[in-house]
Structures are given as C-alpha cells and as structure tokens.
C-alpha cells in the first residue's frame, strides 16, 4: 500500500473532535465553516496558491435525512483534520464549509450557485441522489468536481466529467442482493416495495433488471410516494401474493416504517435491502426484533470487517463519542480520494482536479477505488444478515 493510501489515525483523532460544530441550518444557502487547522474562516483569503484549499460539504443537517448528513460531515471532517494535522496539501490546509441542503433538490440547486460564488474548489456530498442530480449541471458549468454519496443510476445518466461516486451504484447493490437471494437461498417469490424519488426509482429499476437476469418476475411490485408514512394498503396487497422475500427500495426512515408495518400485518417474508438497512435509523424505526434476519447488500458491513475498519471506527469514536456506519465510512473514503487527488496535482482546480480524481487508485474502507469514465470507482458489495441489531457478514 502506498503512503497516500495509508490511514493516519492516532493523534489526528483528537484534532477531528473539533469538527463537531455543525448545527442544523434552516435557510437555503445557510452554511457554517469547519474550524480548519489553519484557523481561517469562510471567506476568500489571499491568493489561491497561498491560502487554504476551500471545499464545500453539502448534506442535510435538517429534515428527514439529517442523520445521514451528520454521519457524512463527521466522516469528511475526520479525514480532513487528519491531513491538516499532518501538514495539509503542500503546506496548505483544507478548509471545509458545511451547507445544509435539507434533503431538497431545490435547495441543492440554490446551494450549487452559492458554492461557486463562495470560492469552493470542490464539493463532497450529498447523501441524497436527487439533490446531487439537481446540483450537477451547475457544478459542471462552474467546473467544480463533486464526490457524492448518492448511488442512483440516475447519477451516471448526468454524464458529467465532474461527478464521482464514493461507493457503488444501486445496480451493484441490487445485483449482489438478487444473486444471493435467488441463487444462494433459492427464493423465487419476491415482492418489491419502492418509493418514487430518484433513489427509489433507481432501486426499482436495478432490482427488476437483476431479477430478470436470473429469470425471476416479482410476484408483486408497489410504489409509494417518498413522504408516505402509512404503507398498509400496499403491504396488504403484497401480503396477498404470499412472497418469500420483500425487497425494499426507500430511504432509511421510510424503509424502517415499511418493515414495522409489514410485521404488524403478519407479513413474514424475509426483508432484503441495500444501504439503508445498514443504518441506525433503519434499525431504530423498524425495531430490532422486526429487523432481525434482514438481508443487507453493502460495501461496508460494520466496524469489525477489517483492520482498516477497526482503526477508522476507533478514531471516529474517539472524535465523536459514537460509532460510525456506512455513510460515515463512505464520506471518509470520498474525502480521502479528494485528498489523494489534491496531493498529486498540488492543489489544482477545475478539470485538472477532476482528471486527478479519475486517476486515483485508493485502497479504501469500502474497497479498492479505480474510477471509470462514468465516475464510478467501487464495483462490489457483500452480503450481511442483521442479527440482534448487528450486521453479520455472510461467508
């Protein structure tokens, strides 16, 4: 492993604790600056070559996705505080600025314009595919590279040379999940319940394609609005199809509600899902007993999965007082990819930075990053089973 691929923990964990200052921002365009090790504040300062390297972090700090936004912010802050503690990029410190997208694509569009005006040279986030897709045209026009935590295949359809993913697409999550459910477990009667936003639409498409490749047609397939909280009518219809497996394609809170309501209706099908099922919000919403046995497809199956994951979890916990999960790990990896690119090109910007990101080869928590022309750098997930509230990897 090369020097830029190694994780730097130890004393840097104490520095990372300073990043926990972000508060929820209620107004579109509102932001807060991370206390960079350089001690500078949010505005433009000095020459671009001498001042801090300014990077925007865009994630929900309020609204239904705010928990993901906090995980993302902490993962990014940990990585940046580690590199700043080690001297920064060619002696320049990275300065983060946090923007609250509220999980709203309209707010995201406004923030994309603000980021360009604020002088940020790159963006990390968002966790919401729909928000990232809304921001992408403006970021492309302004030549601002963006490493997103979204996973919808719709991100690829944007065709922006400035847009990169810090994890696999939904197609990878769902292909792995479908193969395990159908081939390894032998289930044939599979129902689907997805929502109608960018993430859910992508999941519906990806899982349908993955099942079709295995000769499976869902016994039931229902779609609900992303803000619907009572899925009883759809689940009742699904129950009548007597499925062996219920695949869910929705964000964390809604997925948890689906599981809770399914069990209340006596629906005993095995639950199968991608990234959302690996989060604390899913588990707390569904209830530990209801979530037990859920099959999860994810590139990050917990903080004990590898020595690197254990070291990351120790540093994260020391800094923030709580354990990380997938989104924190993804954000950390995305920040490390950005840092690696900035080191190689000596703090370059625009298309040069985008090209440097594309050339990065990085051994991350989620796997080995190697970007293709579409902006995807990770192409595999693994299977885990939720047991007593903990994801246990399947050998």
In which residue ranges do the predicted regions lie?
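Beta-alpha junction/loop-to-helix N-cap segments that form part of ligand/metal-binding clefts
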Residues: 40-41, 67-72, 86-157, 224-228, ...
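Bacterial lipoprotein signal-peptidase II cleavage site
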Residues: 22-41
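Sec-dependent bacterial lipoprotein signal peptides
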Residues: 1-23
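Extracellular/periplasmic ligand-binding modules, especially the Venus flytrap/periplasmic-binding
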Residues: 206-208, 255, 304-356
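Extracellular/periplasmic periplasmic-binding protein-like sensory domains
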Residues: 259-332, 386-393
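Extracytoplasmic "Venus flytrap"
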Residues: 42-75, 99-106, 127-130, 193-201, ...
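Segments of small-molecule ligand-sensing domains
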Residues: 324-328, 339-391
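Extracytoplasmic ligand/sensor domains, especially the bilobed periplasmic-binding protein
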Residues: 110, 117-220, 270-293
């Amino acid at each position: 492993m090369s020097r830029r691929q190694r994780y730097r923990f130890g004393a840097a964990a104490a520095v990372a604790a300073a990043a926990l200052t972000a508060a929820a921002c209620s107004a579109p365009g509102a932001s807060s600056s991370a206390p960079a090790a350089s001690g500078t504040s949010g505005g433009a300062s000095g020459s671009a070559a001498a001042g801090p390297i300014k990077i925007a972090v865009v994630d929900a700090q309020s609204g239904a996705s705010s928990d993901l936004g906090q995980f993302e912010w902490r993962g990014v802050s940990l990585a940046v505080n580690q590199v700043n503690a080690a001297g920064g990029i060619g002696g320049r410190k990275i300065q983060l600025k946090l923007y609250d997208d509220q999980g709203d694509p309209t707010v995201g569009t406004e923030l994309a314009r603000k980021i360009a005006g604020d002088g940020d040279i790159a963006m990390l986030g968002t966790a919401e595919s729909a928000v990232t897709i809304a921001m992408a045209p403006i970021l492309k026009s302004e030549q601002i590279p963006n490493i997103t935590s979204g996973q919808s295949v719709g991100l690829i359809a944007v065709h922006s040379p400035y847009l990169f993913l810090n994890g696999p697409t939904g197609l990878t999550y769902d292909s792995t999940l479908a193969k395990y459910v159908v081939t390894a477990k032998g289930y044939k009667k599979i129902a689907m319940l997805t929502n109608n936003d960018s993430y859910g639409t992508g999941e519906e498409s990806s899982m349908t394609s993955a099942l079709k490749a295995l000769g499976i047609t869902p016994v039931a397939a229902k779609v609900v609005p992303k803000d619907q909280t009572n899925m009883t009518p759809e689940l009742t219809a699904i129950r009548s199809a007597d499925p062996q497996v219920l695949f869910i394609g929705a964000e964390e809170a809604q997925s948890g509600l689906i599981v809770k309501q399914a069990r209340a209706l006596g629906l005993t099908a095995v639950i199968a899902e991608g990234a959302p099922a690996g989060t604390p919000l899913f588990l707390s919403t569904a209830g530990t007993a209801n979530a037990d046995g859920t099959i999860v497809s994810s590139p990050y199956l917990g903080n004990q999965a590898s020595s690197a994951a254990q070291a990351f979890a120790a540093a994260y916990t020391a800094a923030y007082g709580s354990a990380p999960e997938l989104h924190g790990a993804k954000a950390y990896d995305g920040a490390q990819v950005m840092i690696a690119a900035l080191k190689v090109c000596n703090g370059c910007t625009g298309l040069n930075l985008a090209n440097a990101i594309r050339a990065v080869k990085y051994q991350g928590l989620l796997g080995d990053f190697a970007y293709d022309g579409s902006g995807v750098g990770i192409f595999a997930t693994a299977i885990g089973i939720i047991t007593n509230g903990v994801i246990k990897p399947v050998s």
